[in-house]
Amino acid sequence: MIGLVALTGYLLACLVSFSAFDPGWTSTGAGGPIRNLGGRFGAWFADLFLHAFGYSAYLFPLIFALLSARILRRSKEVNSRHVRIMHGLGFTLTVVSACGIEFLHFGSGLDHSLGAGGGWLGIVAGSWLLDVF
């Protein structure tokens, strides 16, 4: 449980301290010192997740925090395989729909190089939402 809390804090610190000048998955950086609090891996992680999910990347530390709280409470709920599958499916649908809504809210005219409008997943989900609705 302590490891999960530490992972939550680390991922959140990596996302919050993202800098476009750091070397990451989509850029080589400006050549200066790494500004990300998570170091080189943190810069890479934040770059990848912000490009892939946009602002919805912040849902991942949130779900880890909720999972930590659930473990801390030592929940007596039924924890069958089906319940875990439903929780995972619910989280997946939440992330996909949040990315799509971000894309629709921020508009398709934005520069998606920073992943602002739901990231790459938002482009796919938002385009699908435009076609369907």
Regions found by a protein language model. Give the residues of each.
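Alpha-helical transmembrane segments used as membrane anchors
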Residues: M1-F133
